Amino acid sequence: FGALSPTMWEGLQMGVAYLNEELGMPVRMCTGEGGCPPRLLRSRFIKYVILQIASGYFGWDEIIHALPEMKEDPCAIEIKYGQGAKPGDGGLLMWYKVNSLIARVRGVPAGVSLPSPPTHQTKYSIEESVAKMIQSMYMAWGFRVPVYPKISATSTTNAVLNNLTRNPYAGGLAIDGEDGGTGAAYNVSMDHMGYPIASNIRDAYLNLTKIGKQNEIPLFAGGGIGKNGNLAANAAALIMLGASGVQIGKYAMQAAAGCLGSETDRCNVCNIGLCPKGITSQDPRLYRRLDPEKVAERLVDMYLSFDTELKKVVAPLGRSTSLPIGMSDALGIADKSAAERLQIQYVV
């Protein structure tokens, strides 16, 4: 909350609510770092929202104060430890975007840049982070709301996963690959750091199968799922590699709001609030260019198309009504090294 404009937030909320209420499509929206709009917290539509808590804890005073007034529980709590686009870095909201509302929700002065630490400062080990923080958040909602960590894809993913398998309160693990998006990061982080999501999610799933926990800890894959416009095909492949669900960000902004950024070129004004489309601006002169109803309509159209294409991919496998999680025998690739790395078929 703070990175996206009020009109973008409203459009996404409307679209997600329609997908769930009218179409019965299980799409959820994550707040990202920084809290949640106060009106949404006290709305019944909060049940379609995943509340994210990150190392800066921005916005969580507002959330805790709203707890007694919440009409519904949130869908889940996501504890962000890392982001695929910038492993090892914390979040950053530039001062250009910290207006009076953002400042009030985040509990900070207006017009001040808000960096988050690269780690959760109150925890000093993976064991504490996994066990104590997850348990604390789980207890806060009376053990009704699942809690899971989000990490950037790295070579230490399995170390985190092994700790989760011993934690009875862990609701899953979200892994964010190197192609994930961000509104503010160093170029060196975005261009030269990170780990591919496909091999990382595969390693995690195979690790779970070895210990018989593949049906207990769901894995969620993110980071470049919509790359090159192949959303359904990439999502299906990751599900067959072991993911129980996928997360998208950049693709939704491009499809629903006409984001000018692309895989080969960046607009480069997300972080300073001068987005010409009004997607990532807190300036009323810019965000009023964005019609939330049109954003909602296009978001619904995008997910309907995604659903149709995903069914076309999955139906020939005889799994038209359920996801083929870990069904890697349906995958093939013409790259022998990649086939060996992912333990899937090599086809020529």
Question: What residue spans do the PLM features occupy?
Answer:
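Short, well-ordered coil↔helix boundary/capping segments
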Residues: 293-304
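Structural signal for hydrophobic packing residues in well-ordered secondary-structure cores
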Residues: 13-29, 81, 133-142, 167-170, ...
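N-terminal capping/small domains of soluble enzymes
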Residues: 1-121, 128, 297, 308-309, ...
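Glycine-rich phosphate/ribose-binding loops and adjacent secondary-structure elements
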Residues: 115-290, 294
